[in-house]
Swiss-Prot record:
Keywords: Ribonucleoprotein, Ribosomal protein, RNA-binding, rRNA-binding. It comes from the Bacteria. It holds the Pfam family Ribosomal_S17. One of the primary rRNA binding proteins, it binds specifically to the 5'-end of 16S ribosomal RNA. HAMAP family: Ribosomal_uS17_B. One of its GO terms (molecular function) is structural constituent of ribosome. GO terms for biological process: translation. SUPFAM superfamilies: Nucleic acid-binding proteins (SSF50249). This is Small ribosomal subunit protein uS17.
Amino acid sequence: MPRRILQGTVVSDKGDKTVIVLVERRVMHPVYKKFIKQSKKYAAHDEANAFKIGDVVQIEECRPISKRKRWTVVTGAAAEAGAAS
């Protein structure tokens, strides 16, 4: 089964090796056929504490790391800046 990849914005980086990522989706309302925004927060593993609030990152599904962490950060603004230097 392939691992899901989502894109979102870091809204908290207070935990050690953890960031909270807000993922927004556009879904169509089943009755009114209007697109509405739905958002959900995911706790993601950030091994190097590299990502800060406001960074746009991609997270990938992984094995459970803790009670709430089942995602890991794979790419983002900090990773691209480090690769460019």
